[in-house]
Amino acid sequence: MSRIGKLPIKIADSVKVDIKDNFITVEGKRGKLSQEINSSIRVKIEDNNIIVERAFNNKQTRAFHGLYRSLIFNMVKGVSDGFSKSLTINGIGYRVEQQGNSLFFNLGYSTQFEYVIPEGINIRLDGNTKIAVEGIDKCRVGQVAAEIRSLKVPEPYKGKGIKYDNEVIRRKVGKSGVKK
């Protein structure tokens, strides 16, 4: 039995869950999410809990059991609380500004980078060096944060670049040089 898959998912009062055929739809105060479920996985609602079970007991179905339980749990949490990732820009002259539905980055290059904010994602700027990516879909929030970080990955000598707030950059010592 999957350690993650066997755990029930508690449904909050503000969340409405609908299961039809191989689709599960979760609706809450922040929005609505849907997910297609593999036919080898059964999902049912009992006593205000979502139960995820396997139809078969082969290797692939055992792998899907925990996966779909986690996906459904993230859907329920996303429509009720939402997800957030924070990024920080380090470096002299490095900054970001928002104009409409786009972010413009100055990252030490001769041109600005433009990043168009995808639908369903909210971005808050705190000053011009802090970025908060928010949304109801955990996967999309993480993907957008990773795309923004990839514009200028932190380098190990001075730590210049875009990093997650909880990320620790492994630093290297610079050249020592030979004295004459």
Swiss-Prot record:
InterPro entries linked: Ribosomal_uL6-like, Ribosomal_uL6-like_a/b-dom_sf, Ribosomal_uL6_a/b-dom, Ribosomal_uL6_bac-type, Ribosomal_uL6_CS
Keyword Signal among record annotations: no
Xref: Pfam families: Ribosomal_L6 (PF00347)
GO molecular function, one term: rRNA binding
A GO term from the CC aspect: cytosolic large ribosomal subunit
A single GO BP: cytoplasmic translation
KW Ribonucleoprotein (keyword) present: yes
Keywords assigned: Ribonucleoprotein, Ribosomal protein, RNA-binding, rRNA-binding
NCBIfam families: L6_bact
PANTHER family noted in UniProt: 60S/50S RIBOSOMAL PROTEIN L6/L9, LARGE RIBOSOMAL SUBUNIT PROTEIN UL6M
Subunit structure: Part of the 50S ribosomal subunit.
Family classification: Belongs to the universal ribosomal protein uL6 family.
Role noted for this protein: This protein binds to the 23S rRNA, and is important in its secondary structure. It is located near the subunit interface in the base of the L7/L12 stalk, and near the tRNA binding site of the peptidyltransferase center.
Record protein name field: Large ribosomal subunit protein uL6
Source organism phylogeny: Bacteria, Pseudomonadati, Spirochaetota, Spirochaetia, Spirochaetales
Gene: rplF
